[in-house]
Amino acid sequence: MERGRERGLGQWVSRTFWSTFRNSRQVERALNRVLKPLAVGQRGLNVGAGERRAHQALITVDLDRSLAIDCVADAKRLPFQDRAFAVVLSQEALEHVPDPFQAVREMGRVLNRSGRLLLQVPFVLGYHPDPEDFWRFTAAGLRGLFEQAGLQCEQVEVAYGAGTGLHRILVEFGAGVVERLFAPAYRPAKGCLAIMFYPLKWLDGWLAKRDSNRIAGGFIGIGTKPA
């Protein structure tokens, strides 16, 4: 029972202070823009969704059979017809795909003409296998993902700024020092440090006025399929 409470506390810390996907204005704005067609009855797809459901009209896809998802499938071989969806999105999942270029081409294949693809990718983020962790993308790299899939890149911007990037670096570094001294304390230390340094994330908006993408936490972009 004690272990169960610790897992619950750890999950709360992770979701509240670490693994957040929609807690920035840029992410909220991009999602609201892309998800508008779903309000008029069109279908959408969320690739690598985990148990996150950004909208009730989105079909969720993931490789993990243990999750509460709609479809178990590989992002590189989506089991859907061409032009089946008005909207496709993938948030902080492509870094776990061995061939993200093929995965984005597949997302483009199942997208309607004039449909939109939203991609959110991490930049400054520690190694986090799920089950593996292969890639990090710059803003230019994200544009390249859209272009190689034959999509028109509408926009790419910072999803989480330099404050989040610094938060992640300090948390990982501090937890690593603690682990070197006493290995079992790594996860508790990481949770405490995530809370302690959380105010750094509040600097994202202020730093966005400067050339802060060198240590941005991540990027978000929207691509459109030609009509």
Which residue ranges define each predicted feature?
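S-adenosyl-L-methionine-dependent methyltransferase catalytic module, highlighting the catalytic core
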Residues: 21-25, 101-102, 106, 112, ...
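Conserved N-terminal segment of class I S-adenosyl-L-methionine
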Residues: 1-78, 83, 87-91, 101-104, ...
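Residues that form or flank phosphate/diphosphate-binding pockets in enzymes
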Residues: 55, 98, 129
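Short catalytic micro-motifs in class I SAM-dependent methyltransferases
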Residues: 92-96
